[in-house]
Amino acid sequence: PHDDVWTDVARMRTLNGEQQAGGREMHLCPLQFDIVDRAITQFTMPGETVLDPFAGIGTVPLRAVALGRRGVGFELSPRYWRDAVAYLRAEEDRAATPTLFGLLDATMPAAAAE
């Protein structure tokens, strides 16, 4: 295999599983999370904005938010757009929910952490 060909992509890691589980229309060409994650981390820095002009069910904006970026997407299909908004809201809620270890880190004095 060529060094520039990504052969370690998990083809099943897409939003179509969520679509099917929710009884919603599956996307014809789902993007794999591994491909999107790699592109986002290679070409953007945390806090930057990632734009997807053909967002579909929102994989790129969703993964951008999950990776600490801002995600923006445009979509013509109202059904896909509604699904994408739901995924993004859920991811924002997940990211805003504190974890036990995060709370401990926030409350522990710096000297005690050493």
Model-inferred region functions:
Residues 1-114:
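S-adenosyl-L-methionine-dependent nucleic acid methyltransferase catalytic domains
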